[in-house]
From Swiss-Prot:
The keyword RNA-binding does not apply. GO terms for molecular function: agmatinase activity; formimidoylglutamase activity; manganese ion binding. Its EC number is 3.5.3.8. This is Formimidoylglutamase. The gene is hutG. Keywords: Histidine metabolism, Hydrolase, Manganese, Metal-binding. Binds 2 manganese ions per subunit.
């Protein structure tokens, strides 16, 4: 496991000859040094998780370890639109197959960003990122002696509730469920975009046994958007803290080809964007992550731009 900063990735177009505000994100990004303890006052902080060890363990296609830097490059040229600051905390890299150590390192960095008042946005990497992200949030809340409820909203074609071990990209929410049970805390998990053709009856049974609230992909289409947003708003109102995780394989393959398991149906990008904005403006979003972007299977950087667009919706 290694840590690396990414300042050289932030390059883009300069339009100083044009009138008005032409600032792009690469011009406002700041490298977040671990030794710096300056309060972040709610500023967004990017953190990469260069790992697809969990995808490999889950018999998927590798390549997501290269996702975070490709998403940064797509973000670099996005107009800032008045965003005062964006921070980059570098990458946690799992370069030796030791997934568990990488997840602990990720958790520590997420905890530290939260302690400074930042909003961590973790860029995966496989969806094994979720176990590290959640542990970081939980560690921060424990340090604050905060026993408030944590709602997890996962936009995903898969439950990721596999009970098999060792842990993989298919197990993070089962791991979280077990951790919540050990702590005597509720497991508040909403999974949106589940594909019945990509999850076995055993996984549906596991979700039912855990009391998971799930909505299948066919019921996440634009015609259902108003109802879905109202339901989510009610759930968010009833919680104290929100963790939003977006597995990019929830999107239709035509929109997001660059994942290990492209979706035949999927959730429309406009629907995912609306949910991201609902979370962002709720005042309860504590941490978010984007998982499974795999540049090896991208077309003309389409997937990177989609991931960057969703990232922007979460902090712009």
């Amino acid at each position: 496991m290694t840590m690396a900063l990414t300042q050289n990735l932030w390059q883009g177009r300069v339009d100083d000859g044009e009138r008005g505000d032409t600032t792009r994100l690469f011009r406002i990004v700041h490298v977040l040094e671990a030794a710096d303890v300056t309060p972040l006052d709610g500023a967004p902080v990017l953190l990469g998780f260069n790992c697809d060890a969990g995808v490999l363990r889950n018999q998927g296609r590798p390549g997501a370890a290269h996702g975070p830097d490709a998403i940064r490059q797509a973000l670099a040229n996005v107009p800032a639109h008045g965003l005062p600051a964006l921070y980059d905390a570098g990458n946690v890299s799992c370069d030796d197959g030791d997934l568990e150590s990488a997840q602990l390192a990720l958790a520590g960095t997420v905890r530290d960003v939260l302690a400074r008042g930042g909003l961590p946005l973790v860029l995966g990497g496989g969806h094994e990122v979720a176990w590290g992200t959640w542990q970081g949030l939980r560690a921060h809340l424990d340090a604050q002696d905060d026993g408030g409820r944590v709602l997890i909203i996962n936009i995903d074609a898969h439950f990721d509730l596999r009970t098999s071990r060792p842990a993989s990209s298919g197990t993070p929410f089962d791991q979280i469920a077990n951790a919540c049970a050990e702590r005597g805390q509720p497991f508040d998990y909403v999974c949106l975009g589940v594909s019945r053709l990509s999850n076995t009856p055993a996984l549906f049974s596991r979700a039912d046994a855990l009391g998971v609230c799930y909505v299948e992909d066919v019921d996440m289409q634009e015609r259902h958007l108003e109802s879905r947003l109202a339901e989510l708003a009610a759930r968010i109102d009833a919680t104290d803290h929100l963790y939003l995780t977006i597995d990019l394989d929830a999107l239709p393959a035509a929109v997001m080809p660059a994942v290990s398991a492209p979706a035949a149906c999927g959730v429309p990008l406009t629907v995912v964007e609306e949910i991201a904005m609902l979370a962002r403006h709720s005042g309860k979003l504590r941490v978010a992550d984007l998982a499974e972007y795999n540049p090896q299977y991208d077309r003309d950087h389409q997937g990177a731009r989609v991931a960057a667009r969703l990232a922007w919706r979460l902090f712009g």
